[in-house]
């Protein structure tokens, strides 16, 4: 009879920086080895169990071992580690609550458990997150629960253990309804067969007394559900060590159970596990010593091998099978219940939803609706009722209603835009019947999946909405979904380099050759470009291990806004922990995990453009007297807005401001709203990889006939794709079209199509879409479709898997494209001001936003203490438009309070921040400033704030330019308050003889502007280098696009400041750069071969000289195709010749300009003459001073 064995001690890489293999790796290896069962037991977490659970759906698994769901409990009070496995659903709920209790008293990513916690949760109900309506409060925080009782969690008391580094925390317990919910253990003692099975895991150097006491306490607590784990460590003393453990178990009368205490699925992962240990222990391989495993034996082993190792104790092997047989729980048993929304008395949720829908119809269609829309709404409501989703729609409606009541802009997007019900409820802004969107894409009776509604809110005010959800549902029923932060190329290279002992400059050089966040590793060319030898054994090993590490989970973080809401307590489904941000809690599972266990989430997302639009609307109302809402801006075909977009004038416009979109606009020439839908979707990996863009443009421009692919002969209806592809001229551009082609033309079953859709959604991370390729292409070709069309369709599907837009999503975004373009066209002053006040967002830095506004006739005025406020503002009209006044927020390092953030802080009871800008505005309201001394006296700003203002040239209205203001600030006393009645007349110091200061050259002014406010209204840095570059026959960006040069396709040299670098995944390695000089911008194309040759210049240059050939499209879009790139960033230092500055108070990273006068270091830094041993002032050469802000890089 062949040996049988169940491995119960598997540590995956969700025991972060410990396990050396993915959960999926273990499932496949256990299947290959023919194990009876495999138990996932990560350190104080259940984060990886769903990955293993989901992998059992993989058709490649021939043998499917039983999956045991558990965790490894690690304690803070000296209790030995325990493997914990729940036998049923009730026991699983208690285990989740135990983990939640430990996590909620600790900081993010930590779990502080004691044996007392185990005693409380193993059988009996205990205070859990159901009662924890408010989570951790530091001792200094105010707790707005006057009637709550405060409980201090116990602190460690065993010898030699230090107090945790986090401050003592208080958890507020408030009265919450804790009635037993159906299917849960509630508060009664559980039945004997509902147990958490516990396995004591002795360390290598265990203490006999410690293990004996633990077994005694556990058996008293858990009767027949305790085991002692036996693990061979292969260090020569296993026989003696395991014999000691058997004697301890015999005395305690508990069975022994075998486990290899697995750290990786295969021996080849041992080296990577050593690296992870070094990262965790913050050491290197040569210093780690015994913290590393002594061999490569901690891997999954076949039953025969484990039987051989335990040949003197076969019962320990047999016990693994008995242990596995006692566990019946699977994740299939998690029966999710969506929260019941309050409804009016006598109404059901469905009836209430129908009432709200009717109210929405009257609001949005006061003159009545079409029969078609009425029929669509009735159909949707019927499906919602049959699927039981009314409560979900009511939840989202309630959240949107709250946001609108607080004047927070929001808009639903994604598949929800397919729903007419969502439209009349005010959740989405696009009428799906106008562009023929498909409700079944959102909710289908054929798919047993919950709907998923994504709602965007203003990014500056989303926190208000999130806190409303916590208040509305309680923290016992609401938490944010997790996001798994994975190792990416740069972080993998850095951590592996440190672990292997490579110097910081070597790891930095390797990391700096990586573009963006995604990639598979380093190639030989990149290693050479880092100045290293790829054949060096240590370098080669580092690259190999870093490549293995890419994709490993590094830690958990909170999702950008996905909430899980439950009817009963959430911590009975999944453990909950604290986020790094105050007042945030999140679960351990990510969006794919909760999809796998069929839990519903509500996405509360942040969108910067909504903030910009709301602020723009406010400025228009304030200064022009006209009030707008999103729904008021109607798209009118072929108006001035579309004409602006046709010219490619889209800087700042949502979704169409990238280089690729700006080039597409003149080619597509949008004339109506649906053209914008296509514009948003067409510059995406799906249509590009599927080679669908050029055919669509040619057909749109009448350059080729519109034809619809069709099957041959008797294979099917010749027009079966006409209805699917009619709106896009026979060319599939949207995700829905590709899916419908799979069903209608490739004859995929609904289940296969659903699997394909899921594969598309996870392609970028998982890459499982390839298994559908042969079927889809084969079926299409078999039915007579052209093979090229079939291949292109599937390439398009793979592109959508990388990053593609469904039609409904594109339609939602197209609405914001039009609104932002309308504001840019009709109100460029308000648009510029709102964009600046909404930073950071978008493709372009403030310098380009301001430059674009000025080119459109908007006057922009500098920061000035007599006129500016914290935010940028509009001033009196200057010509057609109001002038934009830059605000104090533009000054790097200057303290100003965002009113949106202040509102959240006040609601949370936090003290207001020190707002220097508000001090200036308040002082100015009492009278005009007359001098710098008076300004300093009545604002009482610290010396550092005055230096920042002077360096930003903000005292011009007081008759002081930058140099004079800096000199005057130097003469002021340090931050020592003067007596009340002496302050008005006190002189800061003895008058100095007035010394005329040399005028600051304009080039230095521009440099200082960029250093302080990130832009200059005085000029462009390239203006002052023009003579230098002209002597080298370098042309301007404007000259690159001159008509005679476009026609000739000539060779040119052009130089400029790098604004944006892009490497789209659909461009096959091509880099697109946008550079700027004083005349405008130029688009640069860098082919992969050139990129590899000039990687350092492409990735690192702030100012670059490009040599290449002009390439122009028929629509007049011009590119310079690079053949050679030269980093000329050092030329910026020429503008700052003589600009060497000492350090300033409070660590300000600013430097005073040199003058003919001697610096008074004592005035700035205190008298240092009596401290000869004090370190010398650190100076920085001008070429090391940051002059230009970094480019904005996208991939």
Swiss-Prot record:
Gene3D superfamilies xref list: Metal-dependent hydrolases
Any GO CC annotation of this UniProt entry: cytoplasm
Region (Disordered): 1163-1195
A Gene Ontology biological process term: DNA repair
Keywords: Cytoplasm, DNA damage, DNA repair, DNA replication, DNA-directed DNA polymerase, Nucleotidyltransferase, Transferase
GO molecular function, one term: nucleic acid binding
Compartments it resides in: Cytoplasm
InterPro entries: DNA_pol3_alpha_NTPase_dom, DNA_pol3_finger, DnaE2, DnaE2/DnaE/PolC, DNAPol_HHH, NA-bd_OB_tRNA, PHP_dom, Pol/His_phosphatase_N
One Pfam family it belongs to: DNA_pol3_finger
EC numbers on record: 2.7.7.7
PANTHER family for the chain: DNA POLYMERASE III SUBUNIT ALPHA, ERROR-PRONE DNA POLYMERASE
Function of the molecule: DNA polymerase involved in damage-induced mutagenesis and translesion synthesis (TLS). It is not the major replicative DNA polymerase.
Family: Belongs to the DNA polymerase type-C family. DnaE2 subfamily.
Name listed for the protein in its UniProt record: Error-prone DNA polymerase
Organism: Rhodopseudomonas palustris (strain ATCC BAA-98 / CGA009)
Gene: dnaE2
């Amino acid at each position: 009879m062949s040996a049988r064995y169940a491995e119960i001690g598997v540590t995956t890489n969700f025991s972060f920086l410990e396990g050396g293999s993915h959960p999926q790796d273990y499932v496949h290896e256990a299947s290959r080895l023919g194990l009876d069962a495999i138990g996932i037991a990560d350190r104080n977490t259940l984060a990886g169990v769903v990955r293993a659970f989901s992998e059992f759906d993989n058709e490649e698994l021939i043998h499917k071992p039983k999956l045991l769901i558990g965790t490894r409990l690690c304690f803070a009070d000296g209790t030995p580690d325990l493997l914990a496995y729940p036998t049923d659903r009730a026991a699983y709920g208690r285990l989740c609550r135990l983990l939640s209790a430990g996590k909620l008293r600790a900081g993010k990513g930590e779990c502080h458990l004691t044996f007392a916690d185990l005693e409380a949760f193993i059988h009996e109900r205990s205070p859990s997150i159901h009662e924890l309506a408010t989570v951790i409060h530091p001792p200094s925080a105010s707790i707005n629960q006057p009637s709550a009782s405060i409980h201090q969690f116990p602190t460690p008391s065993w010898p030699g253990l230090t107090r945790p580094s986090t401050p003592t925390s208080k958890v507020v317990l408030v009265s919450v309804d804790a009635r037993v919910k159906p299917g849960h253990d509630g508060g009664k003692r559980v039945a004997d067969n509902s147990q958490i099975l516990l396995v004591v895991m002795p360390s290598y150097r265990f203490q006999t007394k410690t293990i004996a006491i633990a077994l005694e306490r556990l058996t008293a607590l858990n009767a027949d559900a305790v085991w002692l784990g036996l693990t061979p460590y292969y260090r020569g003393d296993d026989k003696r060590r395991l014999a000691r453990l058997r004697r301890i178990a015999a005395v305690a009368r508990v069975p022994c159970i075998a486990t290899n205490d697995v750290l990786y699925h295969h021996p080849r992962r041992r080296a990577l596990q050593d690296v992870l240990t070094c990262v965790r222990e913050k050491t290197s391989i040569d210093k780690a010593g015994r913290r590393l495993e002594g061999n490569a034996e901690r891997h999954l082993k076949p039953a025969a091998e484990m039987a051989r190792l335990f040949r003197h104790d076969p019962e320990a092997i047999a016990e693994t099978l008995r242990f596995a047989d006692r566990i019946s729980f699977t994740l299939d048993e998690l029966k999710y219940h969506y929260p019941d929304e309050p409804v009016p008395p006598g109404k059901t949720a469905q009836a209430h939803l129908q009432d709200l829908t009717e109210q929405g119809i009257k609001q949005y269609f006061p003159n009545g609706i079409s029969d078609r829309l009425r029929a669509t709404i009735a159909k949707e409501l019927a499906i919602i009722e049959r699927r039981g989703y009314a409560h979900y729609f009511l939840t989202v409606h309630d959240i949107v209603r709250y946001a609108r009541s607080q004047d927070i802009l929001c808009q639903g997007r994604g598949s929800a835009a397919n729903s007419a019900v969502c439209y009349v409820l005010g959740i989405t802004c696009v009428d799906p019947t106008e562009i023929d969107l498909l409700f079944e894409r959102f909710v289908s009776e054929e798919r047993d999946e919950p709907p998923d509604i994504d709602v965007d809110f203003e990014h500056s005010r989303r926190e208000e909405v999130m806190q409303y959800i916590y208040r509305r549902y309680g923290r016992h029923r609401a938490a944010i979904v997790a996001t798994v932060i994975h190792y990416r190329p740069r972080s993998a290279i850095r951590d592996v380099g440190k672990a292997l002992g490579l110097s910081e400059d070597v790891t930095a050089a390797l990391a700096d050759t990586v573009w963006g966040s995604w990639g598979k590793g380093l190639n030989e060319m990149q290693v050479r470009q880092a100045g290293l030898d790829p054949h060096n054994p240590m370098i080669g090993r580092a690259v190999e291990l870093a490549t293995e590490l890419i994709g490993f989970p590094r830690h958990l973080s909170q999702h950008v806004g996905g909430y899980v809401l439950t009817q009963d307590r959430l911590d009975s489904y999944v453990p909950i922990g604290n986020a790094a941000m105050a007042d945030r809690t999140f679960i351990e599972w990510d969006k794919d995990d909760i999809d796998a266990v069929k839990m519903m989430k509500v996405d509360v997302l942040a969108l910067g453009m909504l903030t910009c639009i709301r602020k723009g609307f406010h400025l228009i109302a304030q200064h022009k007297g006209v009030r707008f809402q999103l729904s008021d801006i109607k798209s009118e075909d072929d108006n001035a807005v579309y004409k602006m977009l046709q010219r490619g004038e889209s800087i700042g416009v949502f979704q169409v401001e990238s280089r690729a979109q700006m080039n597409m606009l003149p080619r597509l020439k949008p004339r109506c709203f649906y053209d914008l839908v296509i514009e948003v979707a067409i510059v995406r990996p799906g249509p590009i990889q599927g080679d669908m863009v050029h055919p669509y443009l040619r057909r749109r421009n009448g350059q080729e006939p519109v034809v619809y692919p069709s099957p041959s002969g008797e294979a099917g209806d010749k027009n079966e794709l006409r209805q699917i592809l009619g709106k896009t001229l026979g060319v599939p551009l949207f995700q829905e079209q590709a899916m419908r082609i799979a069903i209608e033309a490739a004859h995929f079953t609904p289940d296969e199509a659903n699997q394909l859709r899921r594969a598309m959604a996870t392609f970028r991370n998982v890459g499982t879409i390839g298994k559908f390729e042969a079927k889809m292409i084969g079926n299409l070709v078999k039915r007579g479709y052209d093979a090229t069309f079939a291949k292109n369709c599937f390439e398009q599907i793979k592109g959508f898997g990388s990053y593609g837009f469904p039609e409904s999503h594109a339609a939602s975004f197209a609405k914001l494209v039009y609104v932002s373009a309308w504001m840019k066209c009709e109100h460029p002053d308000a648009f510029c001001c709102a964009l600046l006040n909404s930073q950071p967002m978008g493709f372009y830095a403030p310098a380009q936003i301001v430059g674009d506004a000025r080119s459109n006739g908007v006057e922009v005025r500098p920061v000035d203490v007599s006129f500016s406020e914290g935010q940028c503002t509009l001033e009196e009209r200057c010509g057609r438009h109001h002038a934009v006044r830059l605000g104090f927020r533009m000054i790097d390092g200057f303290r100003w309070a965002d009113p949106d953030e202040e509102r959240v802080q006040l609601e949370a009871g936090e003290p207001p921040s020190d707002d220097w800008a508000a001090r200036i505005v308040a002082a100015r309201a009492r009278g005009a400033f007359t001098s710098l001394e008076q300004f300093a006296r009545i604002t009482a700003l610290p010396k550092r704030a005055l230096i920042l203002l002077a360096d930003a040239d903000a005292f011009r209205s007081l008759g002081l330019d930058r140099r004079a203001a800096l000199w005057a600030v130097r003469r002021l006393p340090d931050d020592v308050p003067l007596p009340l009645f002496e302050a008005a007349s006190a002189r800061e110091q003895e008058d100095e003889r007035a010394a005329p200061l040399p005028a600051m050259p304009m080039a230095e002014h521009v440099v200082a502007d960029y250093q302080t406010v990130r832009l200059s209204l005085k000029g462009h840095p390239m203006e002052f280098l023009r003579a230098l570059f002209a002597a080298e026959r370098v042309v301007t960006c404007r000259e690159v696009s001159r008509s005679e040069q476009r026609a000739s396709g000539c060779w040119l040299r052009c130089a400029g400041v790098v604004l944006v670098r892009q490497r789209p995944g659909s461009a096959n390695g091509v880099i697109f750069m946008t550079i700027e000089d004083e005349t405008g911008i130029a688009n640069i194309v860098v082919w992969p071969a050139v990129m590899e040759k000039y990687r350092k210049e492409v990735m690192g240059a702030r100012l670059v000289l490009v040599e290449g050939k002009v390439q122009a499209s028929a629509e007049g879009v011009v590119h310079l195709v690079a053949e050679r790139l030269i980093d000329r960033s050092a030329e910026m230092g020429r503008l700052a010749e003589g600009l060497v500055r000492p350090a300033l108070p409070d660590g300000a990273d600013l430097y005073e300009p040199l003058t003919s006068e001697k610096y008074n270091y004592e005035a700035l830094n205190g008298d240092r003459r009596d401290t000869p041993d004090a370190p010398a002032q650190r100076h920085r050469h001008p070429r090391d001073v940051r002059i230009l802000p970094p480019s904005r890089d996208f991939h």
